């Protein structure tokens, strides 16, 4: 099949896996769940915040067995990290650093020009483009570089945030950031004193996002969570010896009494305690292929036993978790895009780094109305511009 709607109509399916570009996740998932078909959806769950909330609520309503494809959630080392936090090994956590070496595709570059003459034989471009704006077949978007353009992808944060932020979000039980702000470097320079232009339709080559969370039941302290991509990394903690490189991807959870460091997916987790030299405790490096297989198998097993069964409740990234996690990730993208808004229609000055205050219950950014367009990915067409509303 090339048209998922035809497949859902003709086949008697128990479940489907959805590994299409980000901008089509919601439509395909919704169509399947409305027919009672269970879904496994790649990360991020959706292209924007409101789609993630919609799918989460629909899964509950229709009693659908769900799983998002952040396979590290089923890594046994994550249970160990959660126990370290629960047992108070590093005290109250106050700061979390998360980072990735992405992008490994084009970002910060202009959208390629459409050229229908280059469309591969047999490709249905209209079906691939789905709900996004259709300018005609555009070389370079399919099959990979769509990730770097806002109409189709969600950039480095969308691609890796659910793999990396998954670890601290679950361990600390923090699901509703009240503040998000972002800054985007303007490099490289294309000529003397002339920075490269910023393209509205392209995700930036790097970003720095700060989330703030209130104390939770699992961690009685406010937390600042920092996301970095495009080569940005946190300072190397003194407690970690120089021979242990924190790497190009990872998580640092810093508490009163020490820190926890892990790689992508929560693998290679290590516990450090202030005043104690070296690693106090560490996990066995997981075979990520085995973890991924288990993550998918758990979803199949839960389908067999049914919604609400013990196996369903043991799923590590059903939409009750994956939905809020994806919302957090996608709020970071809203902050990134908002920082690149002009202060007014006639201004060449960007808003820049601005704290966005978020009402999670109502899915509204309360202090910059123009930022709300990025929760639904609608184009902002009003000529009015007010920096504070």
Language-model segments: which ranges?
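Beta-loop-alpha module in the N-terminal Rossmann-like domain of NAD(P)-dependent dehydrogenases
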Residues: 1-54
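Extracytoplasmic/secreted proteins, especially bacterial periplasmic and envelope-associated proteins
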Residues: 3, 24-27, 50, 54, ...
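Structural recognition of the beta-strand scaffold that forms the well-ordered cores
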Residues: 17-18, 40-41, 47, 66-68, ...
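A contiguous active-site-proximal alpha/beta segment in oxidoreductase catalytic domains
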Residues: 38-40, 45-122, 127
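Glycine-rich, aromatic-lined ligand/substrate-binding cores of catalytic
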Residues: 121-307, 315-318, 324-335, 340, ...
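A cross-kingdom feature marking charged/low-complexity
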Residues: 361-379
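Conserved small/polar residues in nucleotide/adenosyl-binding loops
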Residues: 380-387
């Amino acid at each position: 099949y090339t048209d998922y709607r035809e497949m859902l109509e003709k086949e008697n399916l128990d479940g489907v896996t959805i590994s299409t570009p980000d901008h089509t996740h919601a439509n395909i998932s919704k169509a399947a769940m409305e027919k009672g078909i269970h879904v496994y959806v790649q990360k991020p769950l959706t292209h924007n915040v409101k789609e993630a909330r919609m799918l989460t609520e629909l899964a509950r309503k229709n009693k659908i067995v769900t799983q998002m494809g952040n396979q590290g959630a089923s890594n046994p080392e994550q249970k160990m990290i959660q126990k370290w936090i629960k047992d108070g090994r590093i005290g109250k956590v106050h700061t979390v650093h998360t980072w990735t070496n992405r992008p490994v595709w084009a970002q910060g570059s202009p959208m390629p020009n459409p050229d229908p003459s280059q469309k591969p034989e047999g490709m249905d471009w209209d079906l691939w483009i789905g709900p996004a704006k259709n300018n005609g077949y555009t070389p370079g978007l399919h099959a990979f570089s769509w990730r770097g353009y806002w109409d189709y992808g969600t950039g480095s944060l969308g691609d890796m945030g659910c793999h990396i932020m998954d670890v601290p979000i679950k361990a600390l039980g923090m699901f509703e950031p009240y503040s998000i702000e972002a800054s985007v470097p303007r490099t490289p320079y294309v000529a003397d004193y002339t920075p490269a232009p910023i393209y509205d339709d392209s995700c930036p080559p790097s970003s720095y996002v700060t989330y703030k969370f209130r104390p939770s039941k699992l961690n009685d302290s406010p937390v600042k969570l920092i996301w970095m991509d495009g080569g940005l990394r946190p300072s190397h903690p003194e407690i970690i010896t120089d021979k242990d490189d924190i790497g190009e991807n990872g998580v640092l959870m810093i508490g009163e009494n020490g820190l926890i460091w892990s790689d992508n997916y929560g693998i290679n987790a290590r516990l450090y305690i202030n005043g104690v030299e070296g690693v106090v405790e560490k996990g066995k490096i997981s075979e990520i292929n085995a973890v991924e297989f288990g993550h998918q198998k758990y979803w199949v097993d839960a389908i067999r036993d049914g919604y609400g069964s013990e196996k369903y409740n043991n799923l590590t990234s059903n939409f009750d978790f994956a939905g809020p996690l994806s919302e957090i990730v996608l709020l970071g993208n809203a902050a990134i895009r908002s920082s690149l808004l002009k202060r007014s229609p006639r201004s060449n000055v960007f808003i820049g780094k601005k704290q966005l205050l978020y009402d999670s219950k109502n899915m509204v950014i309360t202090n910059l109305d123009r930022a709300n367009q990025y929760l639904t990915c609608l184009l902002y067409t009003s000529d009015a511009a007010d920096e504070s509303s």
